[in-house]
Every structure is written in C-alpha cells, then in structure tokens.
Design a protein with these regions (language model features):
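Amphipathic terminal alpha-helices
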Residues: 4-5, 30-33, 318-356
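N-terminal Rossmann/SDR dinucleotide-binding element
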Residues: 1-87, 91-94
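A conserved pocket-lining segment of Rossmann-fold NAD(P)-dependent short-chain dehydrogenase/reductase
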Residues: 150, 194-195, 205-239, 243-246
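Conserved Rossmann-fold NAD(P)-dependent oxidoreductase catalytic core, especially the SDR/UDP-sugar
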Residues: 86-90, 99-103, 107, 111-157, ...
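A hydrophobic C-terminal alpha-helical subdomain
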Residues: 212-225, 289-334
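Glycine/proline-rich active-site loop of Rossmann-fold NAD(P)-dependent oxidoreductases
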Residues: 191-204, 246-256
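Active-site Tyr-X1-5-Lys
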Residues: 153-186
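Mid/C-terminal beta-alpha module of Rossmann-like enzyme folds, strongest
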Residues: 243-308, 350-353
Length: 356
C-alpha cells in the first residue's frame, strides 16, 4: 500500500515541485488548499501541475479544504482520511520580505506552523518542515545545521518568523518524542532542464528590473552596490525536490541545509548576466563607495526597485552541509551546473511567459 502525506503549500514553488517528486516515487498526496470553491482550487492545482510536469499524476492527489491559520487547520474531512497519513509536510509560508505590520508572517509562518504541529501531535505523526537557510539572518562565517537561535539579528520579518517557526518544530519534537525533519533551502530558482518556475519572486525581481533597464542605458555606465566576493547560494528547484524527497524517505530526524556547496560570487554573477543581458557598462562596488557619489537616474531606479534585496548583495554566511552530505551520500543526486546555460534558461522561460 502506498504512503499518503498531508502537504501544505502545494501551489507554491517549493511545495509544487516536491509534490511531483514524491508522486513519482509512489507517494499519494492529500493537498491542503484554502480555496472554498473546489473549482478554483482545481484550477490552481492544474496550473502548477502543468508547469511542473505532474499533470498525469493528478489522480494521486486529493484536495481537501483547510487553512493553516486555523486551529486543526480548519479541516472538516472524515477521520479515516487522516488515519491513513504517514506524515505531514509543511511547505506553506508567507515569503514576502517586506510587510508593514507583519500580520501575515505571524499568522502563516508562526501560528500556521503551531497549528500544523498541534494536528501532528493529535495524530501522532512525524513532521517535515520546510524552513530556510536564511534563518541565519545577518550571521557571517559558517552556519551549522544544528544551530538555530544564536542571538543573530535579521534582515527582514520573513527571516525572523521562519526562525521562530523552526524553533517551534524542534521544541515540539523534543516534547512529543516524534520525528521531525527540517529542510533549509537557500535561494531556489527555476528547474535545471528548461528554467521553469511556478512563481517569479526573489532574484527574479532583480533580473526583471535589469531586463527592463538595460535596453535604455545607452552609453551610460552604472554602479551596482554589491560586494564582488560575496557569494549567492542558489539551487534549482528540481534539485531541492529530489534532495528533499530522498531525505524525507530516509526518515531520519534532523536539520538539513539544501544548499549549493560551491556557490558563485557576485563577481561571477556579474560576468554571467553581463553576457546574457548585454550589460557591459557596469561596475560592482562596495556600498561605502557607492554612497560616496550621488547615484545617476538608472542607478537610482535599480536601487529603489530592488531595495528589499540589497542586504543579500552585501553579505552571506557559509552553510555547512554535514547532515545533508551524509544523507545524500548514496542517493546519486548531483547539483546541476550553475552556469550561463542554466541562467539563460531561467531568463528565456521568464520572458516566454512574461514573468507571470
């Protein structure tokens, strides 16, 4: 008999690809979706399955109406459906970096996780929690997988609430003596074969601004406030899905950095995208140097449009992968090359669907 999991966040970028990978491995999915209208839920699911290549697996997915912000996830399903579950996989989250009051982050990332854990306790089920490598916040140096709160400060409310939610998971596992797997992906972009993605967020916002501005630059030089030697830890979403699914199947509790062991530097990215976008008149400069001279009009546009991501161009820690490397040692799962070919596919796909 095939295993069945309860999955939150199936229409998100991580949850959608992870769901398809698990379906291909023989797992059935009970998908929690907020849509009160079943037709609307089906349409949203159909869209992501078409993008992720999982349309032929749809009969192994059952949609159930619920809401992680509610007690018991707002579930009104028959008890026998929940009894056949082998685990809960929690992917749903508010991923916006900026929000004035932070209510959505608190409700989704903190309260939502607590509600998932309470249901898992009631059903005595193991939990898989998709966190983020960037709960490290403003830390520098090496971040180990067993470290969570070491007094770090954060760049935004997304990081801080994801850190709080992960702390809840570890505390829950200790108190209930139930297994918990925590997955910490870094920056996750489109899949490696065709560059496909379900959502255009994160680095995509920055790339879209550049694609709009470069044709208007003429002979102007621009400076970009970014430390050339700072790394940007990027992985394709299909690597995230394969690595995560393999780790989940092993069933060994722990925290796993699903990250790039050899991330590119900002200088590397500058060279790649200068070729892809035809951006030849640019310089990466340290922020203090950037601020010493008034930005020109194009520099100002880039800064304003991408301000929320600026901290990530200036600093990044190194993510230790001891647990992940051990777990994947016999899995044959390799990180695809992060090169011009890959990033070219991302841009081609984004442009082909008009970034939506």
């Amino acid at each position: 008999m095939y295993e069945t999991v309860l999955l939150t966040g199936i229409t998100g970028n991580l949850g959608s690809w992870l769901a398809v990978e698990m379906l291909q491995r023989g797992t059935n999915v009970l998908a929690l979706m907020r849509d009160a209208n079943s037709k609307a839920a089906t349409r949203r699911l159909d869209r992501v399955l078409e993008i992720t290549g999982g349309s032929d697996l749809k009969d192994k997915i059952e949609i159930i109406h619920g809401d992680i912000s509610q007690k018991g996830l707002g579930l009104k399903v028959q008890a026998k459906k929940l009894k056949r579950l082998c685990r809960i996989i929690h992917c749903a989250a508010c991923t916006k970096f900026l929000e004035d009051d932070g209510k959505s982050h608190q409700m989704m990332n903190v309260r939502g996780t607590l509600n998932v854990l309470e249901l898992a306790s009631r059903l005595s089920l193991p939990v898989v929690h998709v966190s983020s490598a960037y709960i490290a916040g403003k830390r520098t140096g090496v971040v180990k997988e067993d470290e969570i709160d070491v007094g770090q400060s954060f760049n935004n409310i997304y990081e801080s609430t994801k850190c709080r939610s992960e702390m809840l998971v570890h505390k829950w596992a200790q108190m209930n003596s139930l297994p918990a797997v925590v997955l910490r992906p870094s920056i996750v972009l489109g899949e490696s074969l065709h560059g496909k993605t379900v959502r255009f967020t994160s680095l995509y916002d920055y790339l879209r601004v550049l694609t709009l501005i470069v044709p208007r630059m003429g002979k102007h030089w621009i400076r970009i406030a970014a430390h050339p030697d700072v790394t940007k830890n990027i992985i394709p979403v299909d690597y995230f899905a394969k690595a995560s699914s393999y780790i989940i199947d092993r069933g060994v509790s722990g925290t796993y950095h699903i990250t790039n062991p050899a991330p590119l530097t900002m200088k590397d990215f500058g060279e790649i995208f200068s070729r892809l976008l035809g951006l030849s008149r640019y310089r990466l400069v340290h922020v203090d140097s950037f601020l010493r001279r008034k930005p020109n009009e194009i520099e100002m546009l880039i800064q304003k449009a991408t301000a929320v991501y600026n901290p990530y161009l200036l600093s990044e820690p190194s993510f230790d992968r001891t647990h992940t490397d051990s777990a994947l040692a016999d899995g044959g799962i390799q990180l695809p090359a992060m090169d011009s070919s890959y990033f070219g596919k991302l841009l081609d796909y984004a442009c082909s669907v008009r970034w939506r």
